[in-house]
Amino acid sequence: GAGCPLTVAIAGPVTVSGQHHTWLIPLLETGWVAYLSTTDAVCYHDGHRALDGYGGEPIYEVPIFGDDGALRESGTIRVTDMGFDEQVLLDQDRFLTACLLRPEFQKKMTGTELRHLLGGYYAAQEAKNGVTPGLLATCQRLSIPILVGAPGDGSVFLNAMKLWAMRQAGLLPSDGPSFDLDVAAEVFESCAYHHW
């Protein structure tokens, strides 16, 4: 296939483990990849290293067959053999919620547009904290769309659902945040790439 662009599908602890810096981002930078298909969790965990107050590396190795009860008691979240303080998730949620409240997110959009916009915010946060660019920032810079087949499998979309639920419960104004994920348009977008 000369002239045939690649589509790459990844899952698992790619960003939380830092593998994206080792092999995925270099692959994307070759220019051969038309789009990336992944999970919402991969996109969510991509932001942890750029959060304020963690010095660029809040994630550390833990025994994969260790005592999960003891980790839980200490407030440590485990993803395979990687661990981080539970506060990292809470800070990531605050960061995402702040992004989703910004004006450019207040419309109906595909997940590729959502992740492109988030990539810009991840990139700014990474630059601010001197962190190596992550997956969303790299895809945003290279204009590589990121498709997620199951947006509810991670907390990027769950933060959007939190805002929707708060609006429904009267905790936010009824004319408050209006982000709306257009799943049908994203399916058509994916089909268009395959047809191309």
Describe each region flagged by the PLM.
Residues 1-10, 16-196:
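Conserved catalytic alpha/beta core of Sir2/sirtuin-type deacylases, generalized to analogous enzyme cores
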